[in-house]
Amino acid sequence: MTYKKTTAVIFEKPGKLEVREASLRAPAANECLVESDWSGISTGTERLMLTGEMPSFPGLGYPLIPGYETVGKVVESPDGSELRPGTHVFAPGSVGFTDARNLFGGSARHIICPEDRLIPLPKKLGSEGVLLALAATALHALRRCEQKGPPELIIGHGVLGQLLARLTRIIHGTIPTVWERDPARRPAGLDYAVYDACQDPRHD
């Protein structure tokens, strides 16, 4: 039974994207209805889903609604929940669409998410809140290599590379070197060095 109609980004099939109406079921007793303000776009996973190049895994199919980096505000929440309506949250996707696969379902105006998967955010973060998932990935990577010490070299200066470099400075107080081939990703004025690999003065 349809609980709510909303607007969503939908990959109808490989190579075909539409923005159209989608149907949500009613939230379960442990779920919240969230109104989205922003949703990040993954240039890896979601691009592969759009082009049809994503390796098969259980649940993959079309049509699908992408999005696992959503920031919005709670509209409805369970009785007694600390996430009251109006609370700004990060959501790693949606579980509630009935006419498209939720992979991962966050790129829609309204989404349904289990309460325990929502992370409250300061309102002032705004659209920058969508970086939470990538920041968590970077932090997890740094924690996994703690026994070996902080990274001296980071390869790639995309969003994840930038987060790794900045978190290395914050957590370890050390300055990493970053290799990046694309000149557009080597801006001036950073507090760490970004080189084309062949221009790095270190050769060890």
Regions inferred by a protein language model and the residue ranges of each:
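Short structural boundary motif marking the start of a folded domain
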Residues: T2-A8
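Residue-level recognition of beta-strand termini and adjacent short loop/turns
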Residues: K13-G15, A28
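Conserved hydrophobic/aromatic beta-strand scaffold that supports enzyme active sites
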Residues: V19-L24, V71-K73, H88, H110-I112, ...
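Glycine-rich beta-strand-centered segment in the early N-terminal region that forms part
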Residues: R25-I41, E53-V95, K124
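A short acidic, Gly/Pro-enriched loop at the edge of an enzyme's catalytic core
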Residues: N30, Q199-D204
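Cytochrome P450 core scaffold surrounding the K-helix E-X-X-R motif
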Residues: T43-L50
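NAD(P)H dinucleotide-binding glycine-rich loop of Rossmann-like/cofactor-binding domains
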Residues: V89-I155
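Mid-domain Rossmann-like dinucleotide-binding core that forms the NAD(H)/NADP(H) cofactor-binding site
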Residues: E128-C198
